[in-house]
């Protein structure tokens, strides 16, 4: 059982070891010369790279399919505009949370669960997100991308 304080890095994993994860919130912006859809696809494709996520086994999601998350994020933006008549005023297209763990302190599967719980706390269950756990470096780390 993993216990976490509100949007923090300290948690208690099931082995009874206290751990601190480096966590960073990043606003994702549209790149010049690219559409919002192309930027979202690029970001979600990078996060879900099969070479970094054990062939996709370390990807989880909430209220969207990992296979179509970028398209679903775009649909959500369009629905917001239609329902409210308002467009987003800033150029933030999504948010990413990156979470890194010290080498050897957590398994990839545990890291994905911790990332999912953190993304759920951040979104309060109101927004779709994906969590992709990367194992391509010495330290295991998560990329969590959420629409808003």
Please report, for each region that a protein language model flagged, where it lies by residue:
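N-terminal nicking endonuclease/strand-transfer module with a His-rich metal-binding environment
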Residues: 2-148
């Amino acid at each position: 059982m993993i216990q976490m304080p509100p949007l923090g890095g300290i948690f208690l994993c099931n082995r009874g070891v206290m751990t601190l994860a480096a966590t960073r919130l990043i606003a994702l912006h549209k790149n010049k010369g690219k559409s919002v859809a192309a930027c979202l696809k690029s970001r979600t494709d990078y996060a879900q790279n099969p070479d970094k996520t054990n062939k996709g086994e370390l990807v989880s999601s909430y209220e969207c399919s990992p296979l179509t998350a970028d398209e679903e994020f775009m649909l959500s933006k369009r629905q917001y505009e239609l329902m409210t008549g308002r467009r987003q005023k800033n150029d933030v297209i999504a948010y990413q949370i990156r979470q890194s763990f010290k080498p050897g302190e957590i398994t990839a599967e545990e890291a994905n669960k911790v990332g999912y719980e953190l993304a759920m706390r951040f979104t309060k269950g109101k927004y779709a997100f994906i969590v992709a756990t990367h194992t391509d470096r010495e330290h295991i780390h998560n990329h969590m991308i959420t629409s808003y």
